[in-house]
């Protein structure tokens, strides 16, 4: 089939690679002059299937209200004039029940675990360099209440057979020796030895090169105008004077999929949740993390690359605003300085922001849309890289009419009615 993929982030590029590998003729359209220059550019650097969990969790509405009053809050809201913001938040809060959380987390873990399997096969086949590490990830708890609350997540991990280690403070230092330098700040942790880390930007660039070898055509600086329908079916993409005919169109536009598809009558529940990161040069390897640690209090991840440290996190609801907020810089700097004060040079940090495409229930949209010929691969939130390989393979199998390795139940737009 002739397939057009919209979007050159990690999800779009990985989808294009799988589709080309399956024998399809693929064209990828991207408005920037290269791949992974927006949301995939400087994310937290983790592939964490075990931590695949919705932001919509029991207790979040009350926590969110408290966070609004905190200086280093992990979640903030900047009201906009767009009524979609309020509708999205109400839908998110409606998913904060224990029953909804269990269903949503189960769906996310199913896709994320499958994605890790796909990632391993992909890595073995291609041998690409993205500063990857397979040393697990460690969630850090600063209070006993946080440690006790992790039992709910452990139940889901056990249900899906995800290996884990529940650690005390000494165990955390054993997993991440540099934490011994700040002894007394951590009461325990949850380690997932199967999780991975790496640079998503480097990965996406390498995957784009591999996709080109398979014949994928990349069209950059291409501002997409509309999807053309014929008798109710998506048949082409228009971009200025160019028209790209397609048997199937994959929308992997991240947060921008919502507005782009609205003229077609599709109401995607995908909202841009703004995240921030710092990337600083590592100056002392022994004082730096070995892999990724996640500070549960501030919802900040700290990831070790070869010679750099990436600090990422925060969730800000402020629409499509890409302005850099210095307060978020200060929070990220505070967290890395608190846990790894001698690891990197914060004075030389690169400050970045991106918009994560988030659904109210946390589960992405992977599969067919109500319009024949139009397929969705968006809404992955903070887990775009974690789920990219699995989402790409699953979507490829669905488009190709092949048997799928996992069920797509609950992963499509159909769950929203």
Swiss-Prot record:
Pathway: Amino-acid degradation; D-alanine degradation; NH(3) and pyruvate from D-alanine: step 1/1. One of its GO terms (molecular function) is D-amino-acid dehydrogenase activity. Pfam families: DAO. One of its GO terms (cellular component) is cytoplasm. It catalyses: a D-alpha-amino acid + A + H2O = a 2-oxocarboxylate + AH2 + NH4(+). InterPro entries: DadA (IPR023080), FAD-dep_OxRdtase (IPR006076), FAD/NAD-bd_sf (IPR036188). FAD binds at residues 3-17. Its cofactor is FAD. The keyword Flavoprotein applies. Its EC number is 1.4.99.-. Keywords: FAD, Flavoprotein, Oxidoreductase. GO terms for biological process: D-alanine catabolic process. Belongs to the DadA oxidoreductase family. Oxidative deamination of D-amino acids. PANTHER family: D-AMINO ACID DEHYDROGENASE, SARCOSINE DEHYDROGENASE-RELATED. This is D-amino acid dehydrogenase. It comes from Aeromonas hydrophila subsp. hydrophila (strain ATCC 7966 / DSM 30187 / BCRC 13018 / CCUG 14551 / JCM 1027 / KCTC 2358 / NCIMB 9240 / NCTC 8049). The gene is dadA.
């Amino acid at each position: 089939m002739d397939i057009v993929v919209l979007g050159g982030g990690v999800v779009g590029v990985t989808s294009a690679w799988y589709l080309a590998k399956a024998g399809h003729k693929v064209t990828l359209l991207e408005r920037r002059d290269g791949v992974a220059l927006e949301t995939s550019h400087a994310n937290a650097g983790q592939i964490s299937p075990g931590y695949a969990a919705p932001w919509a969790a029991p207790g979040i509405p009350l926590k969110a209200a408290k966070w609004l009053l905190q200086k280093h809050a992990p979640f903030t809201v900047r009201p906009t004039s767009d009524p979609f913001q309020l509708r999205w938040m109400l839908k998110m809060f409606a998913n904060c029940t224990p029953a909804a959380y269990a269903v949503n987390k189960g769906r996310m873990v199913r896709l994320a675990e499958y994605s890790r399997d796909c990632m391993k096969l992909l890595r073995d086949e291609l041998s690409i360099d993205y500063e990857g590490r397979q040393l697990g990830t460690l969630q850090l708890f600063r209070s006993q209440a946080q440690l006790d609350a992790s039992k709910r997540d452990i139940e889901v991990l056990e249900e899906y057979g995800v290996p884990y280690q529940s650690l005390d403070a000494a165990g955390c230092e054993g997993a991440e020796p540099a934490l011994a330098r700040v002894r007394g700040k951590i009461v325990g942790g949850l380690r997932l030895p199967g999780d991975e880390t790496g640079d998503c930007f480097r990965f996406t660039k390498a995957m784009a090169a591999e996709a080109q070898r398979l014949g994928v055509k990349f069209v950059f600086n291409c501002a997409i105008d509309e999807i053309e329908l014929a008798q109710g079916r998506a048949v082409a993409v228009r971009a200025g004077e160019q028209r790209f005919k397609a048997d199937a169109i994959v929308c992997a536009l991240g947060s921008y999929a919502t507005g782009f598809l609205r003229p077609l009558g599709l109401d995607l529940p995908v909202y841009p949740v703004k995240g921030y990161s710092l990337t600083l040069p590592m100056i002392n390897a022994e004082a730096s993390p070995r892999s990724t640690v996640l500070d549960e209090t501030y919802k900040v991840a700290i990831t070790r690359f070869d010679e750099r440290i990436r600090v990422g996190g925060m969730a800000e609801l402020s629409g499509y605003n890409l302005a850099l907020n210095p307060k978020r810089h200060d929070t990220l700097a505070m967290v890395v300085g608190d846990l790894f004060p001698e690891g990197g040079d914060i004075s030389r940090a690169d400050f970045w922001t991106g918009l994560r495409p988030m659904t109210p229930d946390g589960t992405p949209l992977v599969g067919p849309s109500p319009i024949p010929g139009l397929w969705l691969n968006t809404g992955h939130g903070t887990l775009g890289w974690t789920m990219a390989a699995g989402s790409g393979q699953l979507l490829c199998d669905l488009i190709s009419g092949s048997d799928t390795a996992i069920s797509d139940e609950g992963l499509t737009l159909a769950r929203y009615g």
